[in-house]
């Protein structure tokens, strides 16, 4: 399996279209934002990981996401992947990450220990703070 994309999002919707085919609608894709409350602030984002399973694979793997802040792992999520060979799938990951001050967290996403896809998110200071 391979990761096609990993993004921090506000919401996601899946819908059927003629074909039959499926559409994944992502809204509120983000790479930075102000903390909505004073720091320290605990953030629980939606990380959406889009995955493809080639037709010649069995459709079973494990997705690992390690979240790194200031060079230190602050959260880790491991979940099974089951995607029909030749198809696409999506996984949602919801960590809890506490920011003591503004900074950038990196989500390092990998399948079965393969090369990671890394996605940053920068937490900015609260507006007016």
Question: Each predicted region: which residue ranges?
Answer:
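Aromatic sugar-binding surface patches on proteins
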Residues: 44-46, 84-94
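Short acidic/polar inter-strand loop motif in beta-rich domains
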Residues: 112-119
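Solvent-exposed serine/threonine-rich low-complexity stretches and specific carbohydrate-binding patches
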Residues: 74-85
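Short edge beta-strand/loop segments characteristic of extracellular beta-sandwich folds
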Residues: 48-54
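Non-catalytic, glycine-rich low-complexity segments
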Residues: 1-46, 125-129
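Short tyrosine-centred short linear motifs in exposed loops/low-complexity segments
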Residues: 57-59, 101-105
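Conserved aromatic beta-strand anchor motif in extracellular beta-sandwich/beta-rich domains
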Residues: 65-69, 109
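Short beta-strand edge segments in extracellular beta-sheet folds
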Residues: 81-82, 122-128
